[in-house]
A protein has these predicted regions:
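Catalytic core of pol beta-like nucleotidyltransferases
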Residues: 2-3, 11-17, 33-122
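Short hydrophobic/aromatic beta-strand micro-patches
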Residues: 24-26
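Structural beta->alpha junctions
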Residues: 28-30
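Conserved loop-to-beta-strand segment in the C-terminal subdomain of adenylate-forming
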Residues: 20-21
């Protein structure tokens, strides 16, 4: 494990009694997808035991969409970092890809709204 973040309702101070514990983990790029999957299962088991809860949702940052990656790092609740330089590199890559995606999503939404305003919903 290289990085771990708390995200979701608990990271935003909005968690309740029924909230799950959302944790995003970044694993080494040298691991295969299958190895990352095995590591995820192992980490979930260890976290459930450590936290004495089965309400643990562990997401592998390596394998999720740019939007979810951004949502994981946005609250900036870092639980673990092996290497501060790697953290900076990973977060910069996530932000770059997310901002590129967001730019095009915003343009598509503007175009869609313009068409709706011009032609209506039919």
């Amino acid at each position: 494990m290289e990085l771990a973040y708390l995200f979701g309702s608990l990271a935003e101070g909005k968690g309740g009694a029924l909230s799950d514990i959302d944790i995003g983990v970044y694993l080494s790029d040298t691991l295969t997808k299958a190895d990352r999957g095995r590591k995820r299962i192992e980490l979930i088991g260890r976290l459930m035991s450590l936290l004495r809860s089965d309400r643990v949702d562990l997401v592998l940052i390596n394998d999720v969409s740019p939007v979810l990656k951004f949502e994981i790092i946005r609250p900036n609740v870092l639980l673990f970092e092996r290497d501060p330089d790697l953290k900076v590199d990973v977060e910069q890559r996530i932000m770059s890809v997310y901002l590129d995606w967001k730019y095009y999503e915003d343009r598509m939404n503007q175009h869609l709204l313009k068409r709706i305003m011009e032609k209506g919903l039919t």
